[in-house]
C-alpha cells in the first residue's frame, strides 16, 4: 500500500483530469494503470483536519483535530490505518509532511517526517527541494523494506504548496522547470481585477 498526499492541489490540476497545461506524467501513469475516483470529496478542506481524517477514517467532529500542532493521541492513533496494518504484520512508513502535531517515532517502523521547509540539504550536501527529498526517502523505504513482508507507506509531499515567505511563491526545481519550457501558463480565471473588485474587501484583500 502506498498513499501519496499532495498539499494544496486542486482536483483539476492534473493531466489525468484533463488539464492541458499542468504536467503530471507520473500521476497520469498511476491514473491510467489504476483506478481513478472522480466523485471523491474531502470532508473538511483544511490541511491538518484532512490529514487526520485520512489517517483515522473519521470526521473532524469525531477525531477532534481542529488546529495546527495538535497531534492524534496514542489511544485513537491505535485505530488509524497505519497502526491497524502494522498490527496485522505490515511494515509501515511515513515520509514527508505530517501536519498533525509532532509524529511519534514509535508509531511507524520508518519515520522521516519534516515540517516547515521547502529547500533542504541532500545527503551529499547539495541543496534540493523537499519534494525531491520526499521521493528519495520513499524510494529508500521501498528498497530497504523486509522482503516478503507486506508494507504500507504514506508519502506526504509538500508540493504544490507555496513557499509562503518567499518573494516568488512557487520555486521550481530544475527538472520540473524543464517540463514547462516553451509553455505559456494562462492566468487564473478568477485573477481578473474586475472579479476581485466585485468581492467584499475581506475576500479581495486575502
Map each language-model feature to its residues.
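Catalytic-site neighborhoods of secreted/periplasmic enzymes
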Residues: 53-141, 145-146, 165-176
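Active-site-proximal N-terminal segment of extracellular/periplasmic enzymes that hydrolyze or transfer
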Residues: 1-44, 69, 86, 161
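Solvent-exposed loop/turn segments at secondary-structure junctions
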Residues: 8-11, 36, 43-46, 60-61, ...
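Structural recognition of the beta-strand scaffold that forms the well-ordered cores
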Residues: 2-5, 36-41, 47-48, 53-55, ...
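A short beta-strand-to-alpha-helix junction
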Residues: 19-24, 41-46, 70-79, 125-135, ...
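Active-site-proximal cap/lid insertion segments
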Residues: 8-21, 117-129, 143-149, 154-206
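Extracellular/periplasmic catalytic domains that process cell-envelope and extracellular macromolecules
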Residues: 21-23, 29-32, 36, 46-48, ...
Amino acid at each position: 500500500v502506498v498513499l501519496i498526499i499532495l498539499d494544496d492541489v486542486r482536483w483539476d490540476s492534473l493531466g489525468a483530469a484533463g488539464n492541458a497545461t499542468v504536467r503530471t506524467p507520473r500521476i497520469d501513469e498511476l491514473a491510467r494503470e489504476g483506478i481513478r475516483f472522480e466523485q471523491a470529496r474531502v470532508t473538511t478542506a483544511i490541511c491538518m483536519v484532512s490529514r487526520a481524517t485520512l489517517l483515522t477514517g473519521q470526521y473532524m467532529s469525531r477525531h477532534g483535530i481542529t488546529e495546527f500542532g495538535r497531534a492524534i493521541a496514542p489511544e485513537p492513533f491505535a485505530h488509524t490505518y497505519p497502526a491497524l496494518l502494522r498490527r496485522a504484520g505490515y511494515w509501515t512508513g511515513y515520509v514527508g509532511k505530517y501536519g498533525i502535531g509532532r509524529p511519534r517515532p514509535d508509531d511507524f517502523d520508518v519515520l522521516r517526517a519534516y515540517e516547515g521547509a521547502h529547500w533542504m540539504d541532500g545527503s551529499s550536501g547539495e541543496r534540493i527541494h523537499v519534494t525531491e527529498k520526499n521521493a528519495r526517502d520513499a524510494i529508500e523505504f521501498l528498497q530497504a523494506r523486509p522482503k516478503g513482508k507486506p508494507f504500507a507507506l504514506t508519502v506526504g509531499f509538500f508540493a504544490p504548496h507555496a513557499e509562503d515567505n518567499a518573494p516568488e511563491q512557487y520555486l521550481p526545481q530544475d527538472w520540473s522547470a524543464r517540463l514547462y519550457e516553451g509553455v505559456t501558463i494562462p492566468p487564473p480565471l478568477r485573477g481578473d481585477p474586475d472579479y476581485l473588485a466585485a468581492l467584499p474587501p475581506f475576500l479581495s484583500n486575502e
